[in-house]
Amino acid sequence: MQAVQQEIAQALKVQPPFADAAALEAEVARRVTFIKGCLANARLKTLVLGISGGVDSLTAALLAQRAINELRAETGDKAYTFIAVRLPYQVQHDEHDAQACLDVIKADEVHTVDIAPAVRALAAEVVELKNGSPTLVDFVVGNVKARTRMVAQYTIAGARAGLVIGTDHAAEAVMGFFTKFGDGACDLAPLSGLVKNQVRAIARSFGAPESLVEKVPTADLEDLEPGKPDEASHGVTYQQIDAFLHGQPVDQAAFDIIVATYRKTQHKRELPFAP
């Protein structure tokens, strides 16, 4: 492991690879306990999470629903609730995957909020977007989608006295692959410190089908490039990112991209600048 790999892995609190099935189950139990503790500390009984159809939100939701199930069993209090939220922009091209995720999660409640009217209304009011290039406008509006989704989740959480769950993990964090104050905003991040392969392994341990576990990851925020794979944006694969974070050798080109991207996106992982 090179020094910079160790530095980044420590900063992101990257967890070691699962040694075996028992280690995986112990990590699942630890993270479920973490979720339960967050609710106890906040003196709240509701969790809210947006379900995209990808493995990250699927895995976070499975952990959340298990935490809620355990709290109800332990306390006898039926007020504990997990709310899964679908947040499509009109009709999502992979809606069938999102519905398949919901079938696996079996959330206590499922809400759907179409973010398109809000996103379009805001975009129409911003003069700077009227003369921008199509590519720039598409990128900016893509971030508006992510932030609108988080506004919707916090609106539901506020109305139901709940906490919002985030889906960020180490393989996305190192690349700064989230929208600031969008999907990067949350009250708790139960996947933090995990690499992508570990997220998939946890989903698999819950019995999620391989079609969802191994689905090609996509943020799917840009209309001009619908379903664009994360890895196309990264310039490296998740396998390479995972290997880097676990201190394993990666080719020099991938190494340089990961380090440069980590440094360039440092501001996204920090609190706002202050004097």
UniProtKB/Swiss-Prot annotation:
<keyword id="KW-0460">Magnesium</keyword>
<feature type="binding site">
    <location>
        <position position="172"/>
    </location>
    <ligand>
        <name>Mg(2+)</name>
    </ligand>
</feature>
<dbReference type="InterPro" id="IPR014729">
    <property type="entry name" value="Rossmann-like_a/b/a_fold"/>
</dbReference>
<dbReference type="InterPro" id="IPR003694">
    <property type="entry name" value="NAD_synthase"/>
</dbReference>
<keyword id="KW-0436">Ligase</keyword>
<feature type="binding site">
    <location>
        <position position="56"/>
    </location>
    <ligand>
        <name>Mg(2+)</name>
    </ligand>
</feature>
<dbReference type="InterPro" id="IPR022310">
    <property type="entry name" value="NAD/GMP_synthase"/>
</dbReference>
<feature type="binding site">
    <location>
        <position position="167"/>
    </location>
    <ligand>
        <name>ATP</name>
    </ligand>
</feature>
<feature type="binding site">
    <location>
        <position position="196"/>
    </location>
    <ligand>
        <name>ATP</name>
    </ligand>
</feature>
<dbReference type="GO" id="GO:0008795">
    <property type="term" value="F:NAD+ synthase activity"/>
</dbReference>
<comment type="function">
    <text>Catalyzes the ATP-dependent amidation of deamido-NAD to form NAD. Uses ammonia as a nitrogen source.</text>
</comment>
<comment type="subunit">
    <text>Homodimer.</text>
</comment>
<keyword id="KW-0520">NAD</keyword>
<feature type="binding site">
    <location>
        <position position="147"/>
    </location>
    <ligand>
        <name>deamido-NAD(+)</name>
    </ligand>
</feature>
<comment type="similarity">
    <text>Belongs to the NAD synthetase family.</text>
</comment>
<comment type="pathway">
    <text>Cofactor biosynthesis; NAD(+) biosynthesis; NAD(+) from deamido-NAD(+) (ammonia route): step 1/1.</text>
</comment>
<dbReference type="GO" id="GO:0009435">
    <property type="term" value="P:NAD biosynthetic process"/>
</dbReference>
<keyword id="KW-0479">Metal-binding</keyword>
<feature type="binding site">
    <location>
        <position position="180"/>
    </location>
    <ligand>
        <name>deamido-NAD(+)</name>
    </ligand>
</feature>
<dbReference type="Pfam" id="PF02540">
    <property type="entry name" value="NAD_synthase"/>
</dbReference>
<feature type="binding site">
    <location>
        <begin position="50"/>
        <end position="57"/>
    </location>
    <ligand>
        <name>ATP</name>
    </ligand>
</feature>
<keyword id="KW-0547">Nucleotide-binding</keyword>
<dbReference type="GO" id="GO:0005524">
    <property type="term" value="F:ATP binding"/>
</dbReference>
<keyword id="KW-0067">ATP-binding</keyword>
<dbReference type="GO" id="GO:0005737">
    <property type="term" value="C:cytoplasm"/>
</dbReference>
<protein>
    <recommendedName>
        <fullName>NH(3)-dependent NAD(+) synthetase</fullName>
        <ecNumber>6.3.1.5</ecNumber>
    </recommendedName>
</protein>
<dbReference type="GO" id="GO:0003952">
    <property type="term" value="F:NAD+ synthase (glutamine-hydrolyzing) activity"/>
</dbReference>
<dbReference type="GO" id="GO:0004359">
    <property type="term" value="F:glutaminase activity"/>
</dbReference>
<feature type="binding site">
    <location>
        <position position="218"/>
    </location>
    <ligand>
        <name>ATP</name>
    </ligand>
</feature>
<feature type="binding site">
    <location>
        <position position="187"/>
    </location>
    <ligand>
        <name>deamido-NAD(+)</name>
    </ligand>
</feature>
<dbReference type="InterPro" id="IPR022926">
    <property type="entry name" value="NH(3)-dep_NAD(+)_synth"/>
</dbReference>
<feature type="binding site">
    <location>
        <begin position="267"/>
        <end position="268"/>
    </location>
    <ligand>
        <name>deamido-NAD(+)</name>
    </ligand>
</feature>
<dbReference type="GO" id="GO:0046872">
    <property type="term" value="F:metal ion binding"/>
</dbReference>
